[in-house]
Amino acid sequence: MKPLVVFVLGGPGAGKGTQCARIVEKYGYTHLSAGELLRDERKNPDSQYGELIEKYIKEGKIVPVEITISLLKREMDQTMAANAQKNKFLIDGFPRNQDNLQGWNKTMDGKADVSFVLFFDCNNEICIERCLERGKSSGRSDDNRESLEKRIQTYLESTKPIIDLYEEMGKVKKIDASKSVDEVFGEVVKIFDKEG
């Protein structure tokens, strides 16, 4: 059985992680956050990638695609090896740019099917406020205004064109993420009840 993938995209602070947690609970998907996998790998003293990842994350840059895909693939393989029924994955914060998308197509072509792209559309200022609020308790080194403005810039220049590309293929489900968590999830449920 091949993995069925939903890409979850949106700017920093659009609520991707929060909504993914709820989708997992209600629909039994496995949530893979590209950013989280990279952050965990960075902390792993045995990792061959740790220092490199640290450098990219600190500078607000996008980590080389080979690293990210190998981590995502490892997680999908492990999940499905443990339980063959668990073949539905939410991949959050990926693909972030053209390079990511090409890398995915090259490595995963025929090995995984992308059902659709869930796009959380959110006003930049709202996103920044949410992240600054989160930064007070998250301890994430990139939840500060300077890093955030860089991340939003990167998102607009690199990720938005990917969303537009999938839009042309009719694969994007767009949600207004500036509303409350419950309202946003209400919209998510409508999509997943239909798409599954």
UniProtKB/Swiss-Prot annotation:
Region (NMP): 33-63
Phosphoserine PTM positions: 33, 180
Pfam families per record: ADK
Cellular component per GO, a single term: cytoplasm
Function (record text): Catalyzes the phosphorylation of pyrimidine nucleoside monophosphates at the expense of ATP. Plays an important role in de novo pyrimidine nucleotide biosynthesis. Has preference for UMP and CMP as phosphate acceptors. Also displays broad nucleoside diphosphate kinase activity.
Domain notes: Consists of three domains, a large central CORE domain and two small peripheral domains, NMPbind and LID, which undergo movements during catalysis. The LID domain closes over the site of phosphoryl transfer upon ATP binding. Assembling and dissambling the active center during each catalytic cycle provides an effective means to prevent ATP hydrolysis.
Description of how the protein assembles with itself and partners: Monomer.
Name by which UniProt lists this protein: UMP-CMP kinase
